[in-house]
Amino acid sequence: MRTLSDAFIPELPGYYKGKVRENYDLADGRRIIIATDRLSAFDIILTSIPFKGEILTQTARYWFEETADICPNHVLEYPDPNVVVGTRLDILPVEIVVRGYLAGTTSTSILTRYRRGEREMYGMRLPDGLRDNEKLAAPVITPTSKAADGGHDEPLSRAEILAQGLLTQAQWDTVSDYALKLFARGQARAAERGLILADTKYEFGTDKNGTIILADEIHTPDSSRYWIAASYEQALASGTRPDSFDKDFIRSWVAARCDPYKDPIPRIPDEIVEQASRIYAQAYEAITGKAFVPDLSGDTVLDRIRSNLVRFF
């Protein structure tokens, strides 16, 4: 399978490897961000999915353009389908997660905690009697800490964020306002295409002037939970998961076979990986309304990326 599992390019400076993306900091304040095909879930790398990095980059590109009127973003240019060059930012130490439904499979999701009997979480109280995947009265922000690689994200409340000095009051007011407006735009656009944007996460940073800027990715199948709207009511009534366009497909496959936070992860079969690749492509098409045509130039994905980044060497 044609995948990009690693994207180390020794000619580029300032290398940093994240869970999914590999970054290079240029001397002039720009950052080159390469989206690999690695699939991260449960705070680990599960496998690599063909064309995933290209799909994530192009989906985020669509959404950055669709939301540029709401808040500034880090994008400067796209020299390759897997690559964005952006303004280097100081990333704020809080991930801003917005949820419109009682859903999720991770340890920090409100559904997981709700099933354990918790009602007080993230500085809010949820009512009794909610069903799995039920729509909330209004979208809520459920922030988490940004764990170092290998660590686990931890739930935070607004009060804890301010008390710990992770964000100032002004920063919190700005990112929470941006996040809710971005989510509303995402839900509206998704609904036009027969999709439900159930939840998503945003990452913000500050530039050299202290301006808060949207970074990383936005409304991609990795950072978001998308459901097919036509499947929702029946799934809610039957207590099953709505048909989805996101990495919940593999997360659910893994979670059905082990406790991913404690047990060894079973090998994910090739047919599951290939199905996941098709789901990512279908997600791109459903979200953007455009056909996904992968760029197959170059002997390998990394060869193509290298040739497109030569001017940065």
Swiss-Prot record:
GO CC field: cytoplasm
E.C. no: 6.3.2.6
Any one Pfam family match given in the protein's UniProt record, by short name: SAICAR_synt
Keywords, sorted A to Z: ATP-binding, Ligase, Nucleotide-binding, Purine biosynthesis
UniProt similarity note: Belongs to the SAICAR synthetase family.
Reaction it catalyzes: 5-amino-1-(5-phospho-D-ribosyl)imidazole-4-carboxylate + L-aspartate + ATP = (2S)-2-[5-amino-1-(5-phospho-beta-D-ribosyl)imidazole-4-carboxamido]succinate + ADP + phosphate + 2 H(+)
Natural source organism: Mesorhizobium japonicum (strain LMG 29417 / CECT 9101 / MAFF 303099) (Mesorhizobium loti (strain MAFF 303099))
GO molecular function terms noted in the UniProt entry: ATP binding; phosphoribosylaminoimidazolesuccinocarboxamide synthase activity
Keyword Ligase: yes
CDD domains, per database record: SAICAR_synt_Sc
One GO-annotated biological process of the protein: 'de novo' IMP biosynthetic process
Source species, domain of life: Bacteria
UniProt gene name: purC2
Recorded metabolic or biological pathway in which this protein acts: Purine metabolism; IMP biosynthesis via de novo pathway; 5-amino-1-(5-phospho-D-ribosyl)imidazole-4-carboxamide from 5-amino-1-(5-phospho-D-ribosyl)imidazole-4-carboxylate: step 1/2
Protein name as annotated: Putative phosphoribosylaminoimidazole-succinocarboxamide synthase 2
Gene3D superfamilies reported for this sequence: ATP-grasp fold, B domain, Phosphorylase Kinase, domain 1
InterPro entries reported for this sequence: SAICAR_synt/ADE2_N, SAICAR_synthetase_CS
Ligase in keyword set: yes
